[in-house]
């Protein structure tokens, strides 16, 4: 396992990491598991993991957070920009966790069979740069499974329209950007986030040396139904849009 690393695999910072994102998740870490309980989204994520990841695959979990997916992977390394998140993931899973930026992965070329990134990590970075780095560290024909926030999240759109937040919806649609706000121990914390659609991500994948195997959606209805419809046309209105992409050989 250690051959994959450019240097020591324990808590490793890159000099260009985005400090605002790091600080947000450092403060959020202790409350993260309580705030983000979505068992139906996790069920779909794990369904795909079990389908696509085989015994013996060496897996990189980008934006592993507190280790929810990392703990079910047999042979894996976690990566997160937040030291506090990484500490929790390390304690929860007893697996190696690297603290680093997804845009600058501290691993050697062609180190991993598969990579995953669910929920939040890729919403805060330069997606093309992150895809380029994932392509670099994956072996030929390696698979990258990931989700990003959907610009056409119907539940979010309806919720904000009903609240009268028309300007918020309009700005999000136009700029494809937004802000996540939480209150932790009486302190309001914020982080910028990005929204995507299927075509934008598919184009980026193609440009960075991937071919799309299939797409899916998570948190469509936030109910048991999601397990049966995550590949249907309803994925276009999910909270998160997902991709299973294969690295093109000799990239």
UniProtKB/Swiss-Prot annotation:
Q: Does the keyword Methyltransferase apply?
A: yes
Q: Name one GO molecular function term.
A: methyltransferase activity
| Keywords assigned | Methyltransferase, Transferase
Q: Name one Pfam family in it.
A: Methyltransf_11
A Gene Ontology annotation in the biological process aspect, one of them, is: methylation
| UniProt-listed InterPro entries | Methyltransf_11 (IPR013216), Methyltransf_Superfamily (IPR050508), SAM-dependent_MTases_sf (IPR029063)
Describe the family membership recorded for this protein in Swiss-Prot or TrEMBL.
To M.jannaschii MJ0638 and MJ1123 and M.tuberculosis Rv2003c.
What is the protein's given name?
A: Uncharacterized protein MJ1252
- Give the species: Methanocaldococcus jannaschii (strain ATCC 43067 / DSM 2661 / JAL-1 / JCM 10045 / NBRC 100440)
